[in-house]
């Protein structure tokens, strides 16, 4: 999904809101939806979705020149490289969090090796990558994601 979603983060929200119920959410003067507020919950911070931001674009592109497949003795080594481009068309700088995911091997004979993550935080259990970045007004940034998958020749490797 290449859409960019705005999210409002409200820390210590129960200090400001003492009654529960439905709340209407507006952003830039436009109605974006409803949410239920339930005081006494276990979370002290609440996240509210503000919808899609058309002023921020993101594109993930496979770099074919840096993708390859090599045969090594009894294994095949697949290399994948992607470029993630983020563009801020707003008049102000933005804080952005980008998520992607590396494949997770279901078989012990398959090895996924992280090569280039452009500083992403990686979760070993889920394979989720997270980048946090500031992009100045009317500017763009690029991230590189490169990984290798080594698998036995007899095995067909598929990604979901």
Residue ranges and their predicted role:
Residues 1-83, 90-111, 116-119, 137-147, ...:
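Intrinsically disordered, low-complexity Ser/Thr/Pro/Gly-rich interaction regions
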Residues 44, 125-129:
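Beta-strand-connecting loop/turn residues
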């Amino acid at each position: 999904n290449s859409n960019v979603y705005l999210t409002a983060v409200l820390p210590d929200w129960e200090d400001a809101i003492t009654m529960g119920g439905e709340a209407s959410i507006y952003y830039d003067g436009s109605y974006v939806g409803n949410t239920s507020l339930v005081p006494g919950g276990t979370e002290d911070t609440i996240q509210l979705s503000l919808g899609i931001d058309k002023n921020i674009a993101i594109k993930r592109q496979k770099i074919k020149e840096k993708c390859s497949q090599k045969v090594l003795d009894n294994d095949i080594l697949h290399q994948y490289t992607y470029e993630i481009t983020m563009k801020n068309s707003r008049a102000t700088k933005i804080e952005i969090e980008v998520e992607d995911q590396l494949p997770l091997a279901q078989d012990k004979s398959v090895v996924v090796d992280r090569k280039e993550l452009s500083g992403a935080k990686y979760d070993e259990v889920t394979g989720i990558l997270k980048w946090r970045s500031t992009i100045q007004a009317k500017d763009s940034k690029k991230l590189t994601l490169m990984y290798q998958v080594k698998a036995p020749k007899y095995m067909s490797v598929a990604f979901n």
